[in-house]
From Swiss-Prot:
Substrate binds at S107, H108, N109, H110, R129, Q259, E331, S332, Q333, S559. Its EC number is 6.3.5.3. This is Phosphoribosylformylglycinamidine synthase subunit PurL. Monomer. Part of the FGAM synthase complex composed of 1 PurL, 1 PurQ and 2 PurS subunits. Its main location: cytoplasm. Part of the phosphoribosylformylglycinamidine synthase complex involved in the purines biosynthetic pathway. Catalyzes the ATP-dependent conversion of formylglycinamide ribonucleotide (FGAR) and glutamine to yield formylglycinamidine ribonucleotide (FGAM) and glutamate. The FGAM synthase complex is composed of three subunits. PurQ produces an ammonia molecule by converting glutamine to glutamate. PurL transfers the ammonia molecule to FGAR to form FGAM in an ATP-dependent manner.
Amino acid sequence: MTSRVDTVDNAASTPDHPQPFAELGLKDDEYARIREILGRRPTDAELAMYSVMWSEHCSYKSSKVHLRYFGQTTTEEMRSAMLAGIGENAGVVDIGDGWAVTFKVESHNHPSYVEPYQGAATGVGGIVRDIMAMGARPIAVMDQLRFGAADAPDTRRVFDGVVRGIGGYGNSLGLPNIGGETVFDASYAGNPLVNALCAGVLRKEDLHLAFASGAGNKIILFGARTGLDGIGGVSVLASETFGGDEADGASRKKLPSVQVGDPFTEKVLIECCLELYAAHLVVGIQDLGGAGLSCATSELASAGDGGMHIDLDKVPLRATGMTPAEVLSSESQERMCAVVTPENVDAFMAVCRKWDVLATVIGEVTDGDRLRITWHGETVVDVPPRTVAHEGPVYQRPVARPDTQDALIADTAGGLARPASAAELRQTLLDMIGSPHLCSRAFITEQYDRYVRGNTVLAEHADSGVIRVDEQTGRGIALATDASGRYTLLDPYRGAQLALAEAYRNVAASGATPVAVTNCLNFGSPEDPGVMWQFSEAVRGLADGCVTLGIPVTGGNVSFYNQTGTTPILPTPVVGVLGVIDDVNRRIPTGFGTEPGETLILLGDTADEFDGSIWAQVAHDHLGGTPPKVDLAREQLLAQVLTAASRDGLVSAAHDLSEGGLIQAVVESALAGETGCRLLLPEGADPFVALFSESAGRVLVAVPRTEESRFMSMCEARQLPAVRIGVVDQGSDSVEVQGQFSVTLAELREIHEGVLPGLFG
């Protein structure tokens, strides 16, 4: 042991020793509470543990009082298919035939601004390990990305690094990236959002949970060695404040606060874990992500039926001279912590050797209720684990509707100049699809492997992705993620429901039945009452919406302090929806022209709704008014029609309507199918409203002419509005709006696909 180590005995004998708790993010009263819990001052290692585990990121101390609403509103019927939910590493849902799917979305926002490549890459790696920790094989990833204005000076640096990081890590893991969403807005300058979703598949009986039980069971750390990367994010942990000479402290301050990922280590770690699960060698397991060993040990111990002893000096290190505080707080990637019975340790180690994965017994489960950590024989941590992992501070932050909200709502898009001629309508279309907001994302998705492993059935950016789960039966899943910061700023409750509705609709448009929800709630500072009002309203909106739709929230993530200076980002609740499809061969594609002779039918009602729209932003740089109405009962009906139509082969293509309205969906489906079409707008309809309205609850479908009558009868029987608006012209080279304008596919493709390469290529 070196002289710089602060032991429990030393802490007890030096009660007045000054400690840098404020620099570590702890408030005066939080530090006082730690002293009260321990009956003494904490050691440096204990202070490190409490500071990271009581952080906003780990403890949810500002959001917990609001997040409880999800549990309060979830009915037993909604929970019926849920095998694991909020509080676990990821939600798990029974999808039938003995299969289960686990999925979750998490943020890696701040690291992705500091070091975009590694921030995004380790964001993917972290969420993949969450899925692995449930006993599942990861099968797909998606991403929700937000950047500053596309032409802003720093956007290129962040965009390039994030996209390369996601692709570099995911491609190396052999995981298909099956969709997502990319948005550019000035509010995200200096604070990009990188939200990564991963889904995994397992047999129901193979589910694993994070807990340590059975006195005498061994704690095994396996995967990469532990280094100093990731520590800078918790301020002075790597500095001389914890002892050591000035030169050593100065050098450590230069270490990266962003973790460094190695996807090839994670790839063998995945296979190693799956073999360990198959051999039934694991009692409990936890991945090491945020807060590292501090989190893994305290969460495993507090979720079990005993205590835990850890010999911290047995942790394999890749840096010399690390202190206990640094070892506990390191966020080095590609590490897992397992609970293993003594008789299975040798077999566990043999599997790890087979995969060339480093594994070390670092401790054991004990009787009692203490987490005790030693360093070269001396105790540096002796705490009740629940006080670290689950009993941190909980705040009821002030909540206040902003004084500016009424003025924002009053500033509607109603008075904005609209295109008044056919030529102006045509130019509006070209301006919209040629803007960074609605242009093609192919420049991004081409950097991702969407079809690796051979089970990807559908992978359309901004729509749902479909993955085959069972090769024999064709059973599969659909996933979609959506968010609208613009709508949520105008009305947080409705904005969250619109995001839910769009993700739900995207899943249904593929032919799948939506069954469960995950979320990642990205907001500004919780110390701002206006931000907390946005947050609380968004949580209520999402929870109430799930009740109406009858599907549960299985888990999620909260990311606060997303702001530049005192200016917060647009409030961005990202919603992910999981759907189940009995036979992926019946999935509905996006592109026109899969069947000869198709009629285009618009499902749902169109209203004059342009507040918060992309048209208002592109044409007038305007944001104000009230978002489109949301009718979740109608969304449910729409989904039922689409899944029935998919099953019966009545629909050959489908595309939800959202940003950019009908004409945006038409252009994307025409380009996807490489075939033109003719639109005939309803008699008396305002062409601008018909083409560009962003009314929710609508889907454009292509129906084989032989099935048109049957499909329309189905819609009529279910009282779902459906109107014929055109035909697909196979062999045609243009999109024509009869009586208004025509644009060739070549011109549309050139404009639509040239924007991002021009900006970032």
